[in-house]
């Protein structure tokens, strides 16, 4: 299988962590795709140009970190991250959806902040900064929720990648104002799968 990524993509990092946690590293070739450029050869593989993108052994192509993670998790017939049925599963989906919303907003903020100053939209920067702070304030209050504790699950993986991405955004400071999140993130970052996939600093 071939997994196409961008080294700095938090969405690709989610899948890379699942690959490591599921001990699939020898079966999944990780390939850095050239994205956001004209006429990249990658567009012949994935016309959307997005990452992550998985080409399965049978040629099936999958896009979206949640879909790819679920596929990889079920390959051995013993899923580690599958959600339970009924109310517990609904609660996990609810929390994961809001965590992904946090990541989505930070991704917009990051892209905007990495533009040259004269190309940035102050309105977008303000809107996404305020959204991020609201959500991080919420998670600071709820970090002791059972889904953020105990055995590794998708909520923890996605949230760890979210906070890791937040660290890279210029002029966005969250650690000092969210000490519980800072402590949680430091513990999560010590996992080998997180250490191995730590994103590079933006150029």
Protein language model regions, located:
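Acidic-histidine catalytic/liganding microenvironments
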Residues: 22, 178, 191-192
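Short, hydrophobic secondary-structure boundary micro-motifs
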Residues: 79-84, 151, 175-176, 195-200
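GST-like fold's C-terminal all-alpha helical module
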Residues: 99-186
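Non-transmembrane alpha-helical segments in soluble domains
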Residues: 69, 73, 93-96, 136, ...
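Hydrophobic/aromatic-lined pockets within catalytic cores
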Residues: 73-77, 167, 171, 189, ...
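GST-like domain detector, emphasizing the conserved glutathione-binding G-site
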Residues: 1-123
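Charged phosphate-binding loop/patch that engages nucleotide di/tri-phosphates or the phosphate backbone
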Residues: 183-197
């Amino acid at each position: 299988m071939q997994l196409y990524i961008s080294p700095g993509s938090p969405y690709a990092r989610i899948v890379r962590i699942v690959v490591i946690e599921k001990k699939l590293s020898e079966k999944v070739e990780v390939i850095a795709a050239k994205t956001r450029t004209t006429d990249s050869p990658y567009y012949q593989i994935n016309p959307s140009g997005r990452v992550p993108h998985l080409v399965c052994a049978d040629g099936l192509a999958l896009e979206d970190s949640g879909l790819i993670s679920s596929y990889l998790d079920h390959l051995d017939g013993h899923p580690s991250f599958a959600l339970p049925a009924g109310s517990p599963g609904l609660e996990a989906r609810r929390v994961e959806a809001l965590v992904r919303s946090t990541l989505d907003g930070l991704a917009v903020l990051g892209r905007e902040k990495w533009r040259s100053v004269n190309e940035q939209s102050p309105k977008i920067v303000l809107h996404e900064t305020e959204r991020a702070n609201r959500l991080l304030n919420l998670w600071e209050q709820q970090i002791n929720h059972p889904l953020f504790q105990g055995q590794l699950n998708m909520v923890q993986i996605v949230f760890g990648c979210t906070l890791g991405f937040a660290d890279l955004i210029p002029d966005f400071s969250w650690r000092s104002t969210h000490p519980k999140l800072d402590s949680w993130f430091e513990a999560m970052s010590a996992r080998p799968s997180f250490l191995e996939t730590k994103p590079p600093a933006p150029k």
